Amino acid sequence: MKKCYALLIVLVAMTFTFTFPLSLPAADYKAEYKLSTVVAKPMPWGIAGERWAELVKEKTAGRINIKVYPGVSLVGGDQTKEYTAIRQGAIDMAIGSTINWSPQIKELNLFSMPFLMPDYKAIDALTRGDVGKELWKILESKDTVPLAWGENGFRELSNSKKPVRKPDDLKGLKIRVVGSPLFLDTFTALGANPTQMSWA
């Protein structure tokens, strides 16, 4: 199976490592590479995708052109299908999310475990240490080449009905969750009424 290049964003600062094989002859490059982002352009991931595409074009003297497709538009707005589309070659690379890829790569559910990490320092230690390396090996075994970890902040809870200060405040509250069974289970256990909806 063809290797896919993916940029995996875990949890807004991004550090990119350029790893395309620059020694390939021009004939081996596609006219355009498709970069999927889960969110729209004005969001940090969208802005980062656009900037990265510009830098790649600049650093390769125009040999590599990347077009950014925001809002998981290449998979009809369903972020849970992004990883499958990468594996099938419909998407060349992505600024993706472990939440969205966890239905296909169960080990990525680690980052969706409620209250697992107390702060950014702990999550950075996890992704930069042995656990992060092991997760990269798992991704590589599935023909995906991760380039960097990034962060999107800790899970937050917001709604338009009432303040949520303690778990009991969630009882009966209708709340949108991403397409991860773990999120559905977590919010159900907390007494909420979760509904799966895409970000896009």
Name each region found by the language model:
Residues 1-4:
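Positively charged n-region of N-terminal signal peptides that target proteins for export
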Residues 8-20:
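Bacterial N-terminal signal peptides
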Residues 23-37, 47, 57-65, 140, ...:
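Immediate post-signal peptide segment of exported/extracytoplasmic ligand-binding proteins
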Residues 31, 73-78, 91-95:
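N-terminal glycine-rich cofactor-binding segment that shapes the pocket for flavin-like pterin cofactors
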Residues 34-51, 71-76:
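Extracytoplasmic "Venus flytrap"
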Residues 42-67, 182-185:
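Short, polar/charged alpha-helical segment
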Residues 54, 87, 92, 97-197:
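Contiguous mixed-secondary-structure segments that line small-molecule binding/active-site clefts
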Residues 69-84, 179-182, 194-200:
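Short helix-initiation/N-cap motifs at beta->coil->alpha
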